[in-house]
Amino acid sequence: MSVFEAWYMDEESGEDQRLPHKLSPNQPVSVQQLEHIGVFHWKLNADIYENDPELQKIREEKGYSFMDIITIHPDKLPDYQNKLKMFYEEHLHLDDEIRYILEGSSYFDVRDEGDRWIRIAVSKGDLITLPAGIYHRFTVDESNYTKAMRLFVGEPVWKAYNRPADDFDIRKEYVNSLGSS
């Protein structure tokens, strides 16, 4: 998974969440379609993340003032199985979710404006932002390994609100933004 790729998911498959779940035939989703729903992506050099001027520029432009690093692997993340279940529960946040993949690979699933799942494959060097108010979930792929930088504007907030959360103002603002783009 070296190329940023997204596709509509086979939602009927009850298979392992870590599998690609592509439809047959595959239905790719373009970068423009992702941007329409507020999902943005950059490809950076993860080998120099500690001193990367491009990352620093993005952080300054977007106001990403706080960061930490999480390693998602059975040997590195306490309570791994329960954390994976929690990450894969459909939810939204009151703030943007910003993740920079430093090692490994994984999937972010997001809902489009028609409520269909789009699976986004991310791997080393991918920086992705999901807008506040979008329903989404996360899972590792079959590698069972991702090391990611989590970026935040101001103090970090890790509160997830599981679906249904349609009454939240941030959800209403997000849905309204889709009609105006």
Curated annotation (Swiss-Prot):
GO terms for molecular function: acireductone dioxygenase (Ni2+-requiring) activity; acireductone dioxygenase [iron(II)-requiring] activity; iron ion binding; nickel cation binding; oxidoreductase activity. Coiled coil: none annotated. It holds the Pfam family ARD. Keywords: Amino-acid biosynthesis, Cell membrane, Cytoplasm, Dioxygenase, Iron, Membrane, Metal-binding, Methionine biosynthesis, Nickel, Nucleus, Oxidoreductase. GO terms for biological process: L-methionine salvage from methylthioadenosine; methionine metabolic process. Pathway: Amino-acid biosynthesis; L-methionine biosynthesis via salvage pathway; L-methionine from S-methyl-5-thio-alpha-D-ribose 1-phosphate: step 5/6. Ni(2+) binds at residues 91, 93, 97, 136. It is a peripheral membrane protein. Its EC number is 1.13.11.54, 1.13.11.53. Belongs to the acireductone dioxygenase (ARD) family. Monomer. Interacts with MMP14. This is Acireductone dioxygenase. It comes from Danio rerio (Zebrafish). The lineage of its organism: Eukaryota, Metazoa, Chordata, Craniata, Vertebrata.
